[in-house]
Amino acid sequence: MVVYNFKQQFVPLIEMGAKQQTIRSPRKRHTQPGEAMQLYTGMRTKACRKLITPDPLCLSVEPLLMHDAWGIKLNDHWLTRDALTRLALADGFAAWDECLRFFSTVHGLPFEGVLIKWATNR
């Protein structure tokens, strides 16, 4: 089982089920479709807590490239402006521009990673 930590700004959206995806940097092992995932906030602190019980199941893991001039390439296809907006909203941002600023600041651009989607068992 793979564990993911989330910044506080995303916690309410995850807990109410509005955010059911995450964009992540490459790592040794990501969750795989069909696997249970554990979602936490505050890991490695006294404020650590699990966000969803029972554990959600991974639906998909898709390769992603984010570029400041071209947008997002998902599974070898560049997203339209409308699709960028939908992806940003689903990921917990108010708009595509906010999502782009966040990744530019936190990770730098261009950014290569994965889009992970899950389903809750509520």
Where are the regions that the model predicts?
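Catalytic phosphate/metal-binding cores of nucleic-acid and nucleotide-processing enzymes, i.e., regions
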Residues: M1-R122
